[in-house]
Protein backbone atom coordinates (compact mmCIF):
# COMPACT_ATOMS: atom_id res chain seq x y z
CA UNK A 1 0.00 0.00 0.00
CA UNK A 2 1.40 3.41 -1.00
CA UNK A 3 1.88 6.16 1.59
CA UNK A 4 -0.91 8.17 -0.08
CA UNK A 5 -3.42 5.31 0.05
CA UNK A 6 -2.67 4.73 3.72
CA UNK A 7 -3.75 8.26 4.59
CA UNK A 8 -6.63 8.74 2.13
CA UNK A 9 -10.24 8.74 3.34
CA UNK A 10 -13.58 9.11 1.57
CA UNK A 11 -16.48 10.95 3.18
CA UNK A 12 -19.70 12.35 1.66
CA UNK A 13 -18.55 15.05 -0.79
CA UNK A 14 -14.91 14.67 0.22
CA UNK A 15 -12.23 12.50 -1.37
CA UNK A 16 -9.29 13.33 0.90
CA UNK A 17 -5.66 12.47 0.15
CA UNK A 18 -5.04 12.76 3.89
CA UNK A 19 -7.36 13.50 6.84
CA UNK A 20 -5.79 16.76 8.04
CA UNK A 21 -7.96 19.88 7.74
CA UNK A 22 -7.30 23.33 9.24
CA UNK A 23 -10.35 24.20 11.37
CA UNK A 24 -12.62 27.13 10.55
CA UNK A 25 -11.64 30.37 12.26
CA UNK A 26 -8.00 29.36 12.72
CA UNK A 27 -6.86 29.63 9.10
CA UNK A 28 -8.77 32.54 7.57
CA UNK A 29 -9.26 31.82 3.87
CA UNK A 30 -5.76 30.39 3.60
CA UNK A 31 -4.06 33.55 2.31
CA UNK A 32 -1.66 34.06 5.24
CA UNK A 33 -0.66 30.40 5.50
CA UNK A 34 -0.13 30.12 1.73
CA UNK A 35 2.97 32.29 2.21
CA UNK A 36 4.51 29.47 4.28
CA UNK A 37 3.64 26.27 2.38
CA UNK A 38 1.69 24.75 -0.51
CA UNK A 39 -1.88 24.36 0.75
CA UNK A 40 -2.42 21.52 -1.75
CA UNK A 41 -0.61 19.36 0.84
CA UNK A 42 -3.68 19.54 3.09
CA UNK A 43 -6.56 17.09 2.99
CA UNK A 44 -9.06 19.95 2.83
CA UNK A 45 -9.60 23.42 4.31
CA UNK A 46 -12.43 24.66 6.51
CA UNK A 47 -12.57 28.34 5.65
CA UNK A 48 -13.64 31.11 8.01
CA UNK A 49 -17.37 31.45 8.73
CA UNK A 50 -19.48 33.07 6.02
CA UNK A 51 -22.54 35.12 6.97
CA UNK A 52 -25.07 36.68 4.59
CA UNK A 53 -23.91 40.23 5.39
CA UNK A 54 -20.47 41.50 6.50
CA UNK A 55 -19.73 41.17 10.21
CA UNK A 56 -17.26 43.38 12.03
CA UNK A 57 -17.00 41.08 15.04
CA UNK A 58 -16.92 41.83 18.74
CA UNK A 59 -15.13 44.75 20.44
CA UNK A 60 -11.54 44.18 21.59
CA UNK A 61 -9.88 42.61 23.49
CA UNK A 62 -11.27 39.43 22.03
CA UNK A 63 -8.48 36.89 22.63
CA UNK A 64 -7.00 35.73 25.95
CA UNK A 65 -4.43 33.06 26.74
CA UNK A 66 -5.35 30.29 29.19
CA UNK A 67 -3.47 27.32 30.64
CA UNK A 68 -3.05 24.90 27.70
CA UNK A 69 -5.38 26.89 25.48
CA UNK A 70 -6.99 30.19 24.59
CA UNK A 71 -10.30 32.03 24.79
CA UNK A 72 -11.64 33.86 21.75
CA UNK A 73 -14.66 36.06 21.18
CA UNK A 74 -13.99 37.16 17.60
CA UNK A 75 -17.69 37.32 16.76
CA UNK A 76 -17.59 35.69 13.30
CA UNK A 77 -15.90 38.68 11.64
CA UNK A 78 -16.04 38.20 7.86
CA UNK A 79 -16.63 40.26 4.69
CA UNK A 80 -19.99 38.62 3.92
CA UNK A 81 -21.25 36.18 1.28
CA UNK A 82 -20.89 38.49 -1.73
CA UNK A 83 -17.18 39.24 -1.21
CA UNK A 84 -16.38 35.66 -0.21
CA UNK A 85 -18.05 34.31 -3.37
CA UNK A 86 -16.45 36.94 -5.63
CA UNK A 87 -12.92 37.03 -4.16
CA UNK A 88 -11.94 34.63 -1.37
CA UNK A 89 -13.16 31.28 -2.69
CA UNK A 90 -12.09 31.90 -6.33
CA UNK A 91 -8.59 32.85 -5.07
CA UNK A 92 -8.32 29.54 -3.22
CA UNK A 93 -9.52 27.57 -6.23
CA UNK A 94 -7.16 29.35 -8.66
CA UNK A 95 -4.09 28.91 -6.48
CA UNK A 96 -4.85 25.51 -4.95
CA UNK A 97 -7.08 23.57 -7.37
CA UNK A 98 -6.39 20.25 -5.61
CA UNK A 99 -7.70 21.51 -2.27
CA UNK A 100 -11.35 20.64 -1.52
CA UNK A 101 -13.06 23.51 0.32
CA UNK A 102 -15.40 23.14 3.28
CA UNK A 103 -17.46 26.34 3.61
CA UNK A 104 -18.46 27.21 7.18
CA UNK A 105 -21.86 28.93 7.32
CA UNK A 106 -23.24 30.97 10.23
CA UNK A 107 -26.25 33.22 10.82
CA UNK A 108 -28.52 34.99 13.29
CA UNK A 109 -31.76 33.41 12.07
CA UNK A 110 -32.81 30.49 9.90
CA UNK A 111 -33.37 32.63 6.78
CA UNK A 112 -29.74 33.85 6.91
CA UNK A 113 -28.40 30.29 6.90
CA UNK A 114 -30.73 29.24 4.09
CA UNK A 115 -29.73 32.20 1.90
CA UNK A 116 -26.02 31.41 2.27
CA UNK A 117 -26.44 27.64 1.85
CA UNK A 118 -28.43 28.17 -1.35
CA UNK A 119 -25.54 30.02 -3.01
CA UNK A 120 -22.19 29.04 -1.52
CA UNK A 121 -22.18 25.55 -3.07
CA UNK A 122 -21.90 27.26 -6.48
CA UNK A 123 -18.42 28.57 -5.64
CA UNK A 124 -15.61 26.63 -7.34
CA UNK A 125 -14.28 23.65 -5.36
CA UNK A 126 -16.70 24.03 -2.43
CA UNK A 127 -17.38 20.35 -1.77
CA UNK A 128 -19.15 20.55 1.60
CA UNK A 129 -20.96 23.06 3.83
CA UNK A 130 -20.17 23.07 7.55
CA UNK A 131 -23.18 24.45 9.41
CA UNK A 132 -22.17 26.35 12.55
CA UNK A 133 -25.21 25.84 14.79
CA UNK A 134 -23.54 27.36 17.86
CA UNK A 135 -24.73 30.84 16.82
CA UNK A 136 -27.38 32.61 18.96
CA UNK A 137 -30.85 32.51 17.40
CA UNK A 138 -32.12 36.12 17.58
CA UNK A 139 -35.74 35.02 17.10
CA UNK A 140 -35.55 32.69 20.10
CA UNK A 141 -34.12 34.96 22.77
CA UNK A 142 -30.51 34.42 21.73
CA UNK A 143 -30.49 30.70 22.53
CA UNK A 144 -27.97 28.90 20.29
CA UNK A 145 -29.50 26.85 17.45
CA UNK A 146 -27.42 23.87 18.51
CA UNK A 147 -28.78 23.57 22.05
CA UNK A 148 -32.28 22.39 21.10
CA UNK A 149 -32.75 19.19 19.03
CA UNK A 150 -35.95 20.42 17.34
CA UNK A 151 -34.56 23.85 16.44
CA UNK A 152 -31.32 22.27 15.16
CA UNK A 153 -33.24 19.71 13.09
CA UNK A 154 -35.49 22.37 11.54
CA UNK A 155 -32.44 24.43 10.57
CA UNK A 156 -30.68 21.43 9.01
CA UNK A 157 -33.81 20.45 7.07
CA UNK A 158 -34.22 23.98 5.68
CA UNK A 159 -30.56 24.25 4.67
CA UNK A 160 -30.44 20.73 3.23
CA UNK A 161 -33.40 21.57 0.97
CA UNK A 162 -31.43 24.32 -0.80
CA UNK A 163 -27.82 23.11 -0.54
CA UNK A 164 -26.11 21.81 -3.68
CA UNK A 165 -23.37 20.02 -1.69
CA UNK A 166 -23.36 17.69 1.35
CA UNK A 167 -24.10 19.30 4.70
CA UNK A 168 -22.03 18.66 7.83
CA UNK A 169 -23.26 20.04 11.15
CA UNK A 170 -20.82 21.48 13.71
CA UNK A 171 -22.00 20.45 17.17
CA UNK A 172 -21.67 22.58 20.28
CA UNK A 173 -20.34 20.95 23.47
CA UNK A 174 -22.19 23.55 25.58
CA UNK A 175 -25.23 21.35 26.13
CA UNK A 176 -26.50 18.99 28.83
CA UNK A 177 -26.66 16.02 26.45
CA UNK A 178 -25.15 16.09 22.96
CA UNK A 179 -26.62 12.74 21.84
CA UNK A 180 -30.25 13.85 21.14
CA UNK A 181 -28.91 16.78 19.11
CA UNK A 182 -26.62 14.54 17.04
CA UNK A 183 -29.47 12.11 16.39
CA UNK A 184 -31.88 14.93 15.51
CA UNK A 185 -29.60 16.50 12.89
CA UNK A 186 -28.82 13.08 11.39
CA UNK A 187 -32.56 12.36 11.09
CA UNK A 188 -33.03 15.80 9.50
CA UNK A 189 -30.62 14.88 6.70
CA UNK A 190 -27.12 15.90 7.82
CA UNK A 191 -24.45 14.09 5.77
CA UNK A 192 -21.81 14.35 8.50
CA UNK A 193 -20.89 15.98 11.80
CA UNK A 194 -17.95 18.12 12.87
CA UNK A 195 -17.18 18.29 16.57
CA UNK A 196 -16.50 19.83 18.88
CA UNK A 197 -16.91 23.57 18.74
CA UNK A 198 -15.34 25.59 21.57
CA UNK A 199 -16.36 25.34 25.24
CA UNK A 200 -17.58 28.56 26.85
CA UNK A 201 -15.25 30.18 29.37
CA UNK A 202 -14.20 33.44 31.01
CA UNK A 203 -11.04 34.97 32.51
CA UNK A 204 -10.68 37.90 34.91
CA UNK A 205 -7.99 40.58 35.10
CA UNK A 206 -6.87 40.86 38.73
CA UNK A 207 -5.84 44.52 38.32
CA UNK A 208 -9.05 45.82 36.75
CA UNK A 209 -11.34 43.31 38.54
CA UNK A 210 -13.09 42.85 35.20
CA UNK A 211 -13.31 40.10 32.57
CA UNK A 212 -10.30 40.04 30.22
CA UNK A 213 -12.54 39.82 27.13
CA UNK A 214 -14.76 42.76 26.17
CA UNK A 215 -17.47 40.21 25.34
CA UNK A 216 -17.04 38.74 28.88
CA UNK A 217 -17.26 35.12 27.69
CA UNK A 218 -15.32 33.42 24.91
CA UNK A 219 -14.78 30.04 23.32
CA UNK A 220 -12.12 27.87 24.96
CA UNK A 221 -9.94 25.89 22.56
CA UNK A 222 -6.54 24.19 22.51
CA UNK A 223 -5.05 21.10 24.20
CA UNK A 224 -7.09 21.71 27.38
CA UNK A 225 -10.31 20.61 25.63
CA UNK A 226 -9.03 17.43 23.91
CA UNK A 227 -10.32 14.97 26.56
CA UNK A 228 -13.77 16.60 26.37
CA UNK A 229 -13.73 16.38 22.56
CA UNK A 230 -12.71 12.70 22.64
CA UNK A 231 -15.45 11.88 25.15
CA UNK A 232 -18.20 13.59 23.14
CA UNK A 233 -17.03 12.18 19.78
CA UNK A 234 -16.95 8.69 21.31
CA UNK A 235 -20.46 9.18 22.71
CA UNK A 236 -21.91 10.40 19.42
CA UNK A 237 -20.09 7.81 17.28
CA UNK A 238 -21.99 5.07 19.16
CA UNK A 239 -25.39 6.38 18.05
CA UNK A 240 -25.00 7.87 14.53
CA UNK A 241 -24.14 6.31 11.17
CA UNK A 242 -22.85 9.49 9.50
CA UNK A 243 -19.11 10.32 9.58
CA UNK A 244 -17.56 12.66 12.13
CA UNK A 245 -14.73 15.13 11.51
CA UNK A 246 -13.11 15.33 14.95
CA UNK A 247 -11.53 18.45 16.41
CA UNK A 248 -10.57 19.94 19.74
CA UNK A 249 -7.01 20.30 20.98
CA UNK A 250 -5.29 18.36 18.18
CA UNK A 251 -1.60 19.24 17.77
CA UNK A 252 0.19 15.96 16.90
CA UNK A 253 -0.09 12.77 14.84
CA UNK A 254 -0.79 10.89 18.08
CA UNK A 255 -3.73 13.23 18.77
CA UNK A 256 -5.07 12.48 15.28
CA UNK A 257 -5.05 8.74 15.93
CA UNK A 258 -6.79 9.28 19.28
CA UNK A 259 -9.57 11.10 17.41
CA UNK A 260 -9.87 8.04 15.14
CA UNK A 261 -10.07 5.71 18.16
CA UNK A 262 -12.95 7.87 19.46
CA UNK A 263 -14.83 7.46 16.18
CA UNK A 264 -13.69 10.26 13.85
CA UNK A 265 -13.17 9.73 10.10
CA UNK A 266 -11.06 12.88 9.51
CA UNK A 267 -9.50 15.47 11.82
CA UNK A 268 -9.44 19.27 11.98
CA UNK A 269 -6.57 21.21 13.56
CA UNK A 270 -7.44 24.60 15.04
CA UNK A 271 -5.59 26.55 17.75
CA UNK A 272 -2.29 24.72 17.09
CA UNK A 273 -1.99 26.71 13.81
CA UNK A 274 -1.48 29.89 15.84
CA UNK A 275 1.43 28.41 17.78
CA UNK A 276 3.03 26.77 14.73
CA UNK A 277 1.94 27.76 11.20
CA UNK A 278 3.49 24.52 9.89
CA UNK A 279 1.63 22.20 12.28
CA UNK A 280 -0.66 20.68 9.61
CA UNK A 281 2.07 19.63 7.12
CA UNK A 282 4.18 18.38 10.07
CA UNK A 283 1.33 16.15 11.25
CA UNK A 284 0.74 14.83 7.71
CA UNK A 285 4.45 13.98 7.39
CA UNK A 286 4.61 12.29 10.81
CA UNK A 287 1.37 10.31 10.54
CA UNK A 288 2.69 7.24 8.62
CA UNK A 289 5.54 6.81 11.12
CA UNK A 290 3.17 6.94 14.11
CA UNK A 291 0.75 4.58 12.34
CA UNK A 292 3.63 2.09 11.90
CA UNK A 293 4.45 2.42 15.58
CA UNK A 294 0.93 1.29 16.52
CA UNK A 295 0.45 -1.31 13.77
CA UNK A 296 -2.08 0.71 11.74
CA UNK A 297 -1.82 -0.06 8.02
CA UNK A 298 -4.39 2.47 6.76
CA UNK A 299 -6.85 5.01 8.12
CA UNK A 300 -9.77 3.45 6.23
CA UNK A 301 -9.02 0.12 7.96
CA UNK A 302 -8.78 1.89 11.31
CA UNK A 303 -12.20 3.51 10.74
CA UNK A 304 -13.62 0.05 10.02
CA UNK A 305 -11.93 -1.48 13.06
CA UNK A 306 -13.40 1.20 15.35
CA UNK A 307 -16.85 0.78 13.75
CA UNK A 308 -16.75 -2.99 14.23
CA UNK A 309 -15.77 -2.61 17.87
CA UNK A 310 -18.93 -0.63 18.66
CA UNK A 311 -21.24 -3.37 17.38
From Swiss-Prot:
EC number: 1.3.1.14
Annotated positions binding substrate: 48, 72-76, 132, 197-198
Positions of the catalytic residues: 135
Cofactor: FMN
GO molecular function annotations of the record: dihydroorotate dehydrogenase (NAD+) activity
Chemical reaction(s) catalysed: (S)-dihydroorotate + NAD(+) = orotate + NADH + H(+)
Pathway annotation from the record: Pyrimidine metabolism; UMP biosynthesis via de novo pathway; orotate from (S)-dihydroorotate (NAD(+) route): step 1/1
Example of a GO cellular component annotation carried by this entry: cytoplasm
Class of this enzyme: oxidoreductase
InterPro entries, per database record: Aldolase_TIM (IPR013785), DHO_dehydrogenase (IPR050074), DHOD_1B (IPR033888), Dihydroorotate_DH_1 (IPR024920), Dihydroorotate_DH_1_2 (IPR012135), Dihydroorotate_DH_cat (IPR005720), Dihydroorotate_DH_CS (IPR001295), Dihydroorotate_DH_I (IPR049622)
Localization terms from the record: Cytoplasm
Highest taxon listed in the record's lineage: Bacteria
Ranges that cross the membrane: none
Binding residues for FMN: 24, 48-49, 104, 132, 170, 196, 222, 248-249, 270-271
GO terms classed as biological process: 'de novo' pyrimidine nucleobase biosynthetic process; 'de novo' UMP biosynthetic process
Cofactor binding notes: Binds 1 FMN per subunit.
Subunit record text: Heterotetramer of 2 PyrK and 2 PyrD type B subunits.
Family per record: Belongs to the dihydroorotate dehydrogenase family. Type 1 subfamily.
Purpose: Catalyzes the conversion of dihydroorotate to orotate with NAD(+) as electron acceptor.
Name listed for the protein in its UniProt record: Dihydroorotate dehydrogenase B (NAD(+)), catalytic subunit
Organism of provenance: Lactococcus lactis subsp. lactis (strain IL1403) (Streptococcus lactis)
Amino acid sequence: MTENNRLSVKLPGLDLKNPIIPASGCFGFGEEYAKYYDLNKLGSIMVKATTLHPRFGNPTPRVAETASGMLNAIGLQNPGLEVIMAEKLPWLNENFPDLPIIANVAGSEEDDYVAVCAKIGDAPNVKVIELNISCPNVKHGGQAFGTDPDVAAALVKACKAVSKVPLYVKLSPNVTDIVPIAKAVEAAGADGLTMINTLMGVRFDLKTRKPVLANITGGLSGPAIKPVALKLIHQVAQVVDIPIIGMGGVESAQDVLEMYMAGASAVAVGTANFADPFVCPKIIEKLPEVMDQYGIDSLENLIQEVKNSKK
